[in-house]
């Protein structure tokens, strides 16, 4: 499992993010404080505080580099 910080600060970004990660069979979790939700769940994402960066846990080693490229617009430096 590897983690990166992402920012999802608009409805369009959330929809785009979920559409992109739904193309992968891997599991993804979003971690915000003490809450951990399935990153493929739009309803779950909207239950988080989206005003701050969120930690994305990627449970895949073989697709990691490709996933990072696809999600580059959401990743916080």
Q: Whereabouts are the PLM-identified features?
A:
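Amphipathic alpha-helical interaction surfaces in cytosolic regulatory modules
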Residues: 11-27, 35-50, 64
């Amino acid at each position: 499992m590897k983690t990166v910080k992402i920012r999802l600060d608009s409805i369009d970004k959330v929809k785009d993010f979920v559409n992109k990660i739904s193309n992968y069979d891997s599991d993804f979790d979003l971690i915000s404080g003490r809450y951990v939700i399935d990153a493929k769940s739009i309803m779950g994402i909207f239950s988080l505080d989206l005003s701050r960066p969120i930690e994305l846990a990627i449970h895949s080693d073989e697709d990691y580099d490709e996933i990072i490229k696809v999600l580059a617009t959401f990743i916080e430096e």
